[in-house]
Regions:
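ASCE P-loop NTPase motor core, strongest for the SF2 helicase catalytic module
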Residues: 1-176
Length: 176
């Protein structure tokens, strides 16, 4: 594992505990403290547990602002190259082909804007883990992006944010 700091290990273990007990969660801390690394460690741990026969591993989905899609792929490749990532980007026909041909165990990465357009593509899919990065992006529960995120079926849902509540408590509720 690439977790180097004690608080990162604590965060990773907390995420595992949430996952194992059927809870979702919000990992909220200041920028640069390693939320991405903790999530990558969780994905890798889940994949390794599945290979050991502890449970079935499905695909996972990371939803983030468009500006972070390639960063997620780069970070996963850097810290856990054994995890196959697939970007769900491009024209609608390309995205449709990508989603239809994804394999179990892959991590799909897409943006909020593309998810809200493509939500029908994901309707019959089950994900092991759904991560929403920069979760404050969906602080308004009435937006198409927020509705799209909530339509995804996943065993474990995790929100990452540096600003969980900016103005109203309802912003926190709208995340999940």
């Amino acid at each position: 594992r690439s977790i180097r700091r004690g608080y990162q290990k604590s965060g990773f273990l907390w995420l595992k505990t949430l996952r194992e007990n059927g809870f979702g969660g919000i990992l909220a801390d200041d920028m640069g403290l390693g939320k991405t690394l903790q999530v990558i460690s969780l994905l890798l741990s889940e994949q390794e547990s599945a290979k050991a026969g502890e449970w079935e591993w499905h695909r996972s989905l990371i939803v983030c602002p468009a500006s972070l899609v390639y960063n997620w792929q780069k970070e996963i490749s850097r810290f856990a190259p054994q995890i196959k990532t697939t970007l769900v980007t491009g024209l609608a026909t390309e995205r449709q082909r990508i989603v239809r041909h994804t394999k179990e165990g892959e991590v799909l990465i897409t943006s909020y804007d593309l998810l809200k357009r493509d939500v029908e593509l994901y309707r019959d899919m089950v994900f092991a883990i759904q991560v929403i990065d920069e979760a404050q992006y969906i602080k308004n529960p009435g937006t198409q992006a927020a509705k799209g995120v909530k339509q995804i079926t996943a065993g474990f849902k995790l929100a990452l944010t540096g600003t969980p509540i900016e103005n109203r408590l309802s912003e926190l509720w709208s995340i999940f």
